[in-house]
Amino acid sequence: MIGDIIAQRYAQALFDLGKEQSLHEVELYDTALSQIEELLMTSNELTYFLHAPIFTIYEKQGVLLKLLELIDAAQPIKNFCLLLAEKERLPLLTQIINSFKVLLDNAKNIVHGQLITAITLDEKKQSELLISLEKQTNRKLELLFQVNPDILGGIVLHIGDKVFDASLRTQLECIRNTIKKGETNHAY
Protein backbone atom coordinates (compact mmCIF):
# COMPACT_ATOMS: atom_id res chain seq x y z
CA MET A 1 0.00 0.00 0.00
CA ILE A 2 2.73 2.47 0.96
CA GLY A 3 4.73 1.25 -2.03
CA ASP A 4 1.82 2.15 -4.31
CA ILE A 5 1.68 5.69 -2.93
CA ILE A 6 5.43 6.14 -3.32
CA ALA A 7 5.31 4.71 -6.86
CA GLN A 8 2.50 7.10 -7.79
CA ARG A 9 4.46 10.08 -6.49
CA TYR A 10 7.57 9.18 -8.47
CA ALA A 11 5.47 8.53 -11.57
CA GLN A 12 3.69 11.87 -11.13
CA ALA A 13 7.02 13.70 -10.76
CA LEU A 14 8.39 12.16 -13.97
CA PHE A 15 5.12 12.78 -15.79
CA ASP A 16 5.08 16.45 -14.72
CA LEU A 17 8.69 16.86 -15.81
CA GLY A 18 7.89 15.55 -19.28
CA LYS A 19 4.65 17.51 -19.52
CA GLU A 20 6.58 20.76 -18.94
CA GLN A 21 8.05 20.10 -22.39
CA SER A 22 5.10 18.52 -24.22
CA LEU A 23 2.83 15.50 -24.33
CA HIS A 24 5.14 14.14 -27.03
CA GLU A 25 8.01 14.23 -24.52
CA VAL A 26 5.87 12.26 -22.06
CA GLU A 27 5.24 9.69 -24.80
CA LEU A 28 9.00 9.40 -25.38
CA TYR A 29 9.43 8.76 -21.66
CA ASP A 30 6.73 6.10 -21.90
CA THR A 31 8.57 4.39 -24.75
CA ALA A 32 11.79 4.26 -22.74
CA LEU A 33 9.95 3.03 -19.64
CA SER A 34 8.27 0.30 -21.71
CA GLN A 35 11.68 -0.85 -22.93
CA ILE A 36 12.96 -0.93 -19.34
CA GLU A 37 9.88 -2.88 -18.28
CA GLU A 38 10.46 -5.39 -21.07
CA LEU A 39 14.08 -5.85 -19.97
CA LEU A 40 12.93 -6.47 -16.40
CA MET A 41 10.29 -8.96 -17.52
CA THR A 42 12.68 -10.93 -19.71
CA SER A 43 15.64 -11.01 -17.33
CA ASN A 44 15.19 -12.46 -13.87
CA GLU A 45 18.89 -11.84 -13.24
CA LEU A 46 18.52 -8.12 -13.93
CA THR A 47 15.48 -7.88 -11.69
CA TYR A 48 17.30 -9.72 -8.91
CA PHE A 49 20.37 -7.50 -9.31
CA LEU A 50 18.37 -4.27 -9.11
CA HIS A 51 16.37 -5.45 -6.09
CA ALA A 52 19.10 -7.19 -4.10
CA PRO A 53 20.50 -5.16 -1.21
CA ILE A 54 23.89 -6.90 -1.45
CA PHE A 55 24.82 -4.80 -4.49
CA THR A 56 25.84 -1.20 -3.93
CA ILE A 57 23.99 1.80 -5.26
CA TYR A 58 26.98 2.58 -7.48
CA GLU A 59 27.00 -0.92 -8.99
CA LYS A 60 23.30 -0.62 -9.75
CA GLN A 61 23.73 2.85 -11.23
CA GLY A 62 26.57 1.60 -13.45
CA VAL A 63 24.48 -1.25 -14.86
CA LEU A 64 21.46 1.04 -15.27
CA LEU A 65 23.50 3.58 -17.22
CA LYS A 66 24.73 0.90 -19.63
CA LEU A 67 21.19 -0.40 -20.15
CA LEU A 68 19.77 3.08 -20.62
CA GLU A 69 22.45 3.89 -23.20
CA LEU A 70 21.59 0.67 -25.06
CA ILE A 71 17.95 1.73 -25.39
CA ASP A 72 18.98 5.33 -26.15
CA ALA A 73 16.96 6.73 -23.25
CA ALA A 74 16.64 10.49 -22.88
CA GLN A 75 18.71 12.19 -20.19
CA PRO A 76 15.72 12.82 -17.89
CA ILE A 77 14.97 9.06 -17.89
CA LYS A 78 18.61 8.31 -17.08
CA ASN A 79 18.57 10.84 -14.24
CA PHE A 80 15.27 9.44 -12.98
CA CYS A 81 16.53 5.84 -12.89
CA LEU A 82 19.77 6.90 -11.20
CA LEU A 83 17.72 8.75 -8.59
CA LEU A 84 15.63 5.63 -7.99
CA ALA A 85 18.84 3.67 -7.42
CA GLU A 86 20.19 6.35 -5.08
CA LYS A 87 16.97 6.42 -3.05
CA GLU A 88 16.80 2.60 -3.10
CA ARG A 89 13.44 2.66 -4.90
CA LEU A 90 14.35 0.32 -7.76
CA PRO A 91 12.11 -2.46 -6.36
CA LEU A 92 9.21 -0.08 -7.10
CA LEU A 93 10.23 0.47 -10.73
CA THR A 94 7.52 -1.76 -12.23
CA GLN A 95 4.84 -0.07 -10.09
CA ILE A 96 6.21 3.35 -11.06
CA ILE A 97 6.05 2.42 -14.75
CA ASN A 98 2.46 1.19 -14.38
CA SER A 99 1.45 4.38 -12.56
CA PHE A 100 3.13 6.46 -15.27
CA LYS A 101 1.15 4.64 -17.97
CA VAL A 102 -2.11 5.36 -16.12
CA LEU A 103 -1.21 9.06 -15.97
CA LEU A 104 -0.42 9.11 -19.69
CA ASP A 105 -3.67 7.32 -20.55
CA ASN A 106 -5.62 9.84 -18.47
CA ALA A 107 -3.88 12.72 -20.23
CA LYS A 108 -4.76 11.20 -23.60
CA ASN A 109 -8.33 10.44 -22.44
CA ILE A 110 -7.81 6.69 -22.92
CA VAL A 111 -9.66 4.11 -20.86
CA HIS A 112 -8.79 0.42 -20.77
CA GLY A 113 -11.53 -2.13 -20.45
CA GLN A 114 -12.79 -5.59 -21.16
CA LEU A 115 -15.76 -6.50 -23.34
CA ILE A 116 -17.28 -9.95 -22.93
CA THR A 117 -19.62 -11.42 -25.53
CA ALA A 118 -21.28 -14.82 -25.84
CA ILE A 119 -19.82 -15.42 -29.30
CA THR A 120 -16.63 -14.45 -31.10
CA LEU A 121 -16.97 -11.13 -32.93
CA ASP A 122 -15.14 -10.58 -36.20
CA GLU A 123 -12.87 -7.54 -36.50
CA LYS A 124 -15.54 -5.50 -38.28
CA LYS A 125 -18.09 -6.07 -35.49
CA GLN A 126 -15.44 -5.34 -32.84
CA SER A 127 -14.57 -2.10 -34.59
CA GLU A 128 -18.22 -1.04 -34.94
CA LEU A 129 -18.91 -1.82 -31.30
CA LEU A 130 -15.78 0.01 -30.18
CA ILE A 131 -16.71 3.13 -32.18
CA SER A 132 -20.24 3.06 -30.76
CA LEU A 133 -18.99 2.71 -27.18
CA GLU A 134 -16.43 5.49 -27.67
CA LYS A 135 -19.20 7.82 -28.83
CA GLN A 136 -21.31 6.95 -25.79
CA THR A 137 -18.45 7.40 -23.31
CA ASN A 138 -16.74 10.35 -25.04
CA ARG A 139 -13.41 8.63 -24.43
CA LYS A 140 -10.99 6.56 -26.44
CA LEU A 141 -11.35 2.94 -25.38
CA GLU A 142 -8.76 0.20 -25.57
CA LEU A 143 -10.73 -2.98 -25.07
CA LEU A 144 -9.74 -6.56 -24.54
CA PHE A 145 -12.40 -8.68 -26.27
CA GLN A 146 -13.25 -11.98 -24.59
CA VAL A 147 -15.80 -14.71 -25.19
CA ASN A 148 -17.89 -16.28 -22.42
CA PRO A 149 -20.80 -18.41 -23.67
CA ASP A 150 -22.25 -18.45 -20.12
CA ILE A 151 -23.65 -14.92 -20.61
CA LEU A 152 -25.95 -16.41 -23.32
CA GLY A 153 -26.12 -13.17 -25.34
CA GLY A 154 -25.56 -9.44 -25.14
CA ILE A 155 -22.41 -7.92 -23.64
CA VAL A 156 -20.68 -7.29 -20.33
CA LEU A 157 -18.39 -4.25 -20.33
CA HIS A 158 -15.77 -3.66 -17.62
CA ILE A 159 -14.28 -0.16 -17.62
CA GLY A 160 -12.16 0.76 -14.65
CA ASP A 161 -14.13 -0.17 -11.54
CA LYS A 162 -17.49 -0.05 -13.35
CA VAL A 163 -19.36 -2.99 -14.86
CA PHE A 164 -22.12 -2.54 -17.44
CA ASP A 165 -23.96 -5.84 -17.68
CA ALA A 166 -26.32 -6.07 -20.65
CA SER A 167 -26.10 -9.84 -20.90
CA LEU A 168 -29.07 -12.05 -21.62
CA ARG A 169 -28.22 -14.15 -18.57
CA THR A 170 -28.54 -11.13 -16.23
CA GLN A 171 -31.78 -10.02 -17.87
CA LEU A 172 -33.24 -13.52 -17.44
CA GLU A 173 -32.15 -13.55 -13.79
CA CYS A 174 -33.88 -10.19 -13.25
CA ILE A 175 -37.09 -11.54 -14.79
CA ARG A 176 -36.85 -14.69 -12.66
CA ASN A 177 -36.36 -12.61 -9.50
CA THR A 178 -39.32 -10.40 -10.40
CA ILE A 179 -41.51 -13.45 -10.90
CA LYS A 180 -40.33 -14.91 -7.58
CA LYS A 181 -41.14 -11.68 -5.77
CA GLY A 182 -44.55 -11.65 -7.38
CA GLU A 183 -45.18 -15.21 -6.20
CA THR A 184 -44.15 -14.48 -2.62
CA ASN A 185 -46.19 -11.28 -2.50
CA HIS A 186 -49.38 -13.08 -3.53
CA ALA A 187 -48.89 -16.30 -1.57
CA TYR A 188 -51.75 -17.27 0.72
UniProtKB/Swiss-Prot annotation:
It is found in: Cell membrane. GO terms for molecular function: proton-transporting ATP synthase activity, rotational mechanism. It is a peripheral membrane protein. Keywords: ATP synthesis, Cell membrane, CF(1), Hydrogen ion transport, Ion transport, Membrane, Transport. The keyword Phosphoprotein does not apply. PROSITE patterns: ATPASE_DELTA. The keyword Cell membrane applies. GO terms for cellular component: plasma membrane; proton-transporting ATP synthase complex. Gene3D superfamilies: N-terminal domain of the delta subunit of the F1F0-ATP synthase. NCBIfam families: ATP_synt_delta (TIGR01145). F(1)F(0) ATP synthase produces ATP from ADP in the presence of a proton or sodium gradient. F-type ATPases consist of two structural domains, F(1) containing the extramembraneous catalytic core and F(0) containing the membrane proton channel, linked together by a central stalk and a peripheral stalk. During catalysis, ATP synthesis in the catalytic domain of F(1) is coupled via a rotary mechanism of the central stalk subunits to proton translocation. Belongs to the ATPase delta chain family. F-type ATPases have 2 components, F(1) - the catalytic core - and F(0) - the membrane proton channel. F(1) has five subunits: alpha(3), beta(3), gamma(1), delta(1), epsilon(1). F(0) has three main subunits: a(1), b(2) and c(10-14). The alpha and beta chains form an alternating ring which encloses part of the gamma chain. F(1) is attached to F(0) by a central stalk formed by the gamma and epsilon chains, while a peripheral stalk is formed by the delta and b chains. This is ATP synthase subunit delta. It comes from Lawsonia intracellularis (strain PHE/MN1-00). The lineage of its organism: Bacteria, Pseudomonadati, Thermodesulfobacteriota, Desulfovibrionia, Desulfovibrionales.
